[in-house]
Amino acid sequence: MTAKNDDAVEALAAAVIPKTRLERCDGSLVDGWVTGEALDSPSGRMNLAQAATMARYLGIPEAALRQGGEDFDGLPHRRQVIGRFGGRLWIDDSKATNVAAVVAALHDAKEPVVILLGGQGKGEDYEPIADAMMGRRVQAICYGQDGAALAKATGGQRVETLAEAVEIARDSAPLGATILLAPACASFDQFT
């Protein structure tokens, strides 16, 4: 995407993204629409802007657009919030089985992040994941058939199985962390 396209998306998002009225601690107000948690990320807002543009083109009323943005719970295994356990946010983005999807998930994740990467690779270059981690508080735990390649690319910790990765994430993630399952790989090697 070019900077010109980014500007166009931002302008469109400003025009159609649901928001609300928020009062800051200093008493100042922020007005506009805010979406539900499932769409509360840069890519979620971009997706909503695109959907709202199409809906408006089709003549769907503004009130329905607002309600849809507020009520949308997301899709299973696509940045699905599993819950907050032990002071950590657990997110299932197991449909992120390619590098581009993982980069987008990392872009949206609130730091610090512990990302679980691994499984059976698809022959992709993992360097874009390392680039997306650069300068951010992200720890990778890498498992499965491509675990070694992912650990090498990201500087992450290598383990054998997804179950081990989950245990280590649970035990080592700092309070307030996001634990993100976005494997960049298929899971065929993890289940028999």
Predicted regions located by residue number:
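Glycine/Thr-rich phosphate-binding loops that ligate phosphate moieties of nucleotide
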Residues: 165, 173-178
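Short beta-strands and strand-loop turn motifs
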Residues: 3, 180-184
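Active-site beta-alpha connecting loops in nucleotide-dependent enzymes
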Residues: 75, 94-162, 186-192
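Short coil/turn connectors at secondary-structure junctions
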Residues: 18-20, 77, 85-87, 109-113, ...
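Short amphipathic alpha-helix with an adjacent loop that forms part of the alpha/beta core around
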Residues: 130-131, 167-172
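Short linear capping/connector segments at secondary-structure termini
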Residues: 85, 184-186
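Acidic, Mg2+-coordinating active-site environments of NTP-dependent enzymes
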Residues: 1-90, 151-152
